[in-house]
């Protein structure tokens, strides 16, 4: 559902005055100004005023704001659970009872001028396909537009988004290129990662050279575009699980000093709900890790923070507590360090914030488990893989 002229519904808490608009100036009061009662588009207060108005309306209808995600509102329990996701003036409604959904729509129509856009097919650039088997998310049209804008439509495709063992540097001696053009392309690719975890590492890697890009960096970006050209239909499929309840399962991994400029490692985090990927993350670590154990431990802590938040959000959506989150790690030393303070001489310098995982393991919220390197699914988020491992 879409709210028409949403910002005009916001009620101002501050005194705001505006000049009389041309064509509506009161004769004899030309030098007077108008006192606004409601918000107008262009006011700094308008977005906040609209959000406060919508929040008030949803709370009045019996909804509760999610403590984990403030853009999500919840009503009812179990089979009568109604979930409303909010993005500015767009509302996504999900529930197991059609009567409850229709009732909510009627109540919203009586409160605001609304447009009912029907079943969700397209949202913020994401194409949504729903069936009895599940839901598929992709960005085919958006990806095709990127190729068209960059002049790469119909280019020769590649099997992987980045060459294995490729190492780029900020100190590249290759000819410089227009930074604005480079940033525009990479920024577009960053949004595509929302439904393409296979692009997370490569896009994150080329994002490190936004300040002074060269033709060498642009070549890596074009490689990503060539890969996209051959995988336009790729996206995320979420299968409906009918028998048992889907469990939250996470994977964390890291490379070792992969950034040749700073020698910092890259963290890769991937979470599944059942067999469905729900969140992924590839980012350069904040500190230089002195060992593979430390790099893996930092990555595991990052995954723990994400897993705790996901478990809390899922608990709210389901209306019941989620069990312990399993976290798969392919480094035995990091697992041992998460369970007890071993290797003191080699780990005593690690920042205290990275020891948060120990508390979560101790109180049972997270279970760290060993997994083989070849089975580590988060590996794709930490380095450029060869074709046989990437596919």
Predicted regions and their residues:
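Structured nucleic-acid-interacting core domains from mobile-element enzymes and related host factors
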Residues: 226-252, 319-321
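RNase H-like nuclease fold core
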Residues: 189, 250-293
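Mobile genetic element proteins and their domesticated derivatives, centered on retroelements
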Residues: 2, 18, 42, 54, ...
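Alpha-helical coiled-coil heptad-repeat oligomerization segments
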Residues: 59, 99-110, 174, 191, ...
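Metal/cofactor- and membrane transport-associated sequence elements
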Residues: 1-113
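C-terminal reverse transcriptase regions that engage the nucleic-acid substrate
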Residues: 40, 88, 116-236, 372, ...
